[in-house]
Amino acid sequence: MQWEVVIGLETHTQLSTVSKIFSGASTAFGAAPNTQAAPVDLALPGVLPVLNKGAVERAIVFGLAIGAKIAPKSIFARKNYFYPDLPKGYQISQYEIPVVQGGTLTFQVEGKNGQPGYEKTVQLTRAHLEEDAGKSLHEDFAGMTGIDLNRAGTPLLEIVTEPDMRSAAEAVAYAKALHALVMWLGICDGNMQEGSFRCDANVSVRRGPDAPFGTRCEIKNLNSFRFLEEAINYEVRRQIELIEDGGTVVQETRLYDPDRKETRSMRSKEDAQDYRYFPDPDLLPLVIGDDWIERVRATLPELPAAMAARFESAYGLPKYDASILTATKATAAYFEAVVADAGAANAKAAANWIMGEVASNLNRADLDIDAAPVSPAQLAKLLARIADGTISNNTAKKDVFPAMWAGEHGGDADAIIAEKGLKQMSDSGELEKIIDDVLAANAKSVEEFRAGKEKAFNALVGQAMKATRGKANPAQVNDLLKKKLGAA
């Protein structure tokens, strides 16, 4: 029996406003408990919520970026439930009419086990504004639970997809693309450790693509891409095994235990009627006119997809390279700065170096590209020295770039090349003499090459490079050898 996995995601993105969605209290992370909670956040009597305009504009920015409809009129509703860290006994959210309606997000799914990657588009159902709840501190007090209301009232944009994903890999790829987009737009800092970006996964299975949807379970508060993938894969296995053993999947909310790598039941899954939604009488309908939308549209940065398309057309980059270079705004800016100095002719080389040597060194040092020890101008100079034949690409990787990364000579490629004596041989007469000596000393390899053994030619190239201590231009060595062997 071929099972099909069906996944939809709800993502809570904390909006990057300085103050909360309905009060003037700060949203800064890490303050002492209950020091950033205004009377509205504490649900003190006689206080009224005031909507944060910045939160609304960030929602509009997101809606425009995904091609969604911005509702001309949306309603705030009270979502009623009891929890100790929810002082009002309800959460202000949006239910029937969200501010952002529809939209799509297109992204790349990496291939696995030899399978090629592919492009995927997910339909978004909605994105609505709401306030966050406070935080229960279970481990800080012996036999008691503490309540920190600093987070209460923090502005969230809850982004909901259609059940369009068919594997954990697709769900993770979507989450990564969404994470990159909200950071690119500047509407969320994307800090998953601090809870700024967290996902709920709705997972079900069915017997093939034409079967009715199965009973779904919601896995709450997944705050890393690894946890998201592990939780979905476990839940899929659990549901399939349960059904195949004659059991029935129960609609419920589950939590993921990363230590045991399993999900466990938290509570039965609520339906909308359980929350008794009704319009909040303290808040007027949110009215967004076309003029407001156009003012916000004018502030939008170039979007990743548009920039990637420009990189393909302007610089002749492959689609994969363009997508990697536009994964973050900082990476794209670094690439464009390198190309501005090195010239468009070196764009492909710049892309290769940024995705290769620069990325691997950043990963090892756990640095963002903004903090790279090698500046775009310094990398551009290194590329120029490769292009003009001063050094080979191999020498640049093995000897020059590591020294630049370590800050030798202020990261100046020319100074490092001179100090280490790495400049390639420019005297063709001297190189020709060395190659003659190599051919004379390796008569067996010459004979094997002439007998049709291509590997013998590579051996001769290696001997020539060794004789020049790596200072010869490999392309020039190849050309001279072929000429002298009559293979040119």
Curated annotation (Swiss-Prot):
Catalytic activity entry? L-glutamyl-tRNA(Gln) + L-glutamine + ATP + H2O = L-glutaminyl-tRNA(Gln) + L-glutamate + ADP + phosphate + H(+); L-aspartyl-tRNA(Asn) + L-glutamine + ATP + H2O = L-asparaginyl-tRNA(Asn) + L-glutamate + ADP + phosphate + 2 H(+)
> What does the entry give for GO biological process?
glutaminyl-tRNAGln biosynthesis via transamidation; translation
Report the EC number(s), separated by commas if there are several: 6.3.5.-
InterPro entries associated with the record: Asn/Gln-tRNA_amidoTrfase_suB/E, Asn/Gln-tRNA_Trfase_suB/E_cat, Asn/Gln_amidotransferase, Asn/Gln_tRNA_amidoTrase-B-like, GatB, GatB_C_1, GatB_Yqey_C_2, Gln-tRNA_amidoTrfase_suB_CS
Q: Does the keyword Nucleotide-binding apply?
A: yes
**A GO molecular-function descriptor:** ATP binding
**Signal sequence span per UniProt?**
none
Identify the keywords attached in UniProt to this record, alphabetized. ATP-binding, Ligase, Nucleotide-binding, Protein biosynthesis
Q: List the disulfide bonds.
A: none
**HAMAP family (alphabetical):** GatB (MF_00121)
The entry sums up its family as follows: Belongs to the GatB/GatE family. GatB subfamily.
Q: Which PANTHER family match?
A: GLUTAMYL-TRNA GLN AMIDOTRANSFERASE SUBUNIT B MITOCHONDRIAL AND PROKARYOTIC PET112-RELATED, GLUTAMYL-TRNA(GLN) AMIDOTRANSFERASE SUBUNIT B, MITOCHONDRIAL
Q: What does this protein do?
A: Allows the formation of correctly charged Asn-tRNA(Asn) or Gln-tRNA(Gln) through the transamidation of misacylated Asp-tRNA(Asn) or Glu-tRNA(Gln) in organisms which lack either or both of asparaginyl-tRNA or glutaminyl-tRNA synthetases. The reaction takes place in the presence of glutamine and ATP through an activated phospho-Asp-tRNA(Asn) or phospho-Glu-tRNA(Gln).
How it assembles, according to the record, is: Heterotrimer of A, B and C subunits.
**UniProt name for this protein:** Aspartyl/glutamyl-tRNA(Asn/Gln) amidotransferase subunit B
Q: Which organism is it from?
A: Ralstonia pickettii (strain 12J)
